[in-house]
Amino acid sequence: MSFRIGHGYDVHKFTSTKKNIILGGIEIPYEMGLEAHSDGDVLIHALCDAILGALCLGDIGKHFPDTDMEYKNTDSKFFLAEIKKMLDDKEYSISNIDCTIIAQAPKMLPHIEKMKACLASVLEIQINQINIKATTTEQLGFIGRKEGIATHVVCLLNR
């Protein structure tokens, strides 16, 4: 059996020109949105990078550049579904995914199970293969000042 580990990170800043955020493929009510070329889903973007990294296929920007208008306002679940095809083509499967959301606000706990279900559906895996946890920065830095959200994702692939 062959194993590969990938790590992904993403961050986006809040903007007052949007309401609500998209995170883990679901909409979360909030007074602001995330500034981005696509839908700004930092969790899916980091997950895409983790999978691509484990496959040695670069990063999300290589495959879906934010300079390409084709991807303007794109639902990030599309990116994840395309990367799932790459995963299948390389004959790897996901063993598990571990995600950390770093946000002062909004509160994530009420939304984690829906995020897990959404990601599991797109990736065609079991919900118990995905862990999502959230933390704050104790009001330190740009995240603590509620200026944005960051995520880290680690995935383990096997063949």
Swiss-Prot record:
PROSITE patterns: ISPF. Keywords: Isoprene biosynthesis, Lyase, Metal-binding. One of its GO terms (biological process) is terpenoid biosynthetic process. Pathway: Isoprenoid biosynthesis; isopentenyl diphosphate biosynthesis via DXP pathway; isopentenyl diphosphate from 1-deoxy-D-xylulose 5-phosphate: step 4/6. InterPro entries: MECDP_synthase, MECDP_synthase_CS, MECDP_synthase_sf. Binds 1 divalent metal cation per subunit. 4-CDP-2-C-methyl-D-erythritol 2-phosphate binds at residues 10-12, 37-38, 59-61, 64-68, 103-109, 135-138, 142, 145. Its EC number is 4.6.1.12. The keyword Lyase applies. Its cofactor is a divalent metal cation. It catalyses: 4-CDP-2-C-methyl-D-erythritol 2-phosphate = 2-C-methyl-D-erythritol 2,4-cyclic diphosphate + CMP. SUPFAM superfamilies: IpsF-like. GO terms for molecular function: 2-C-methyl-D-erythritol 2,4-cyclodiphosphate synthase activity; metal ion binding. The record marks 37, 136 as: Transition state stabilizer. A divalent metal cation binds at residues 10, 12, 45. Involved in the biosynthesis of isopentenyl diphosphate (IPP) and dimethylallyl diphosphate (DMAPP), two major building blocks of isoprenoid compounds. Catalyzes the conversion of 4-diphosphocytidyl-2-C-methyl-D-erythritol 2-phosphate (CDP-ME2P) to 2-C-methyl-D-erythritol 2,4-cyclodiphosphate (ME-CPP) with a corresponding release of cytidine 5-monophosphate (CMP). Homotrimer. Belongs to the IspF family. NCBIfam families: ispF. This is 2-C-methyl-D-erythritol 2,4-cyclodiphosphate synthase. It comes from Francisella philomiragia subsp. philomiragia (strain ATCC 25017 / CCUG 19701 / FSC 153 / O#319-036).
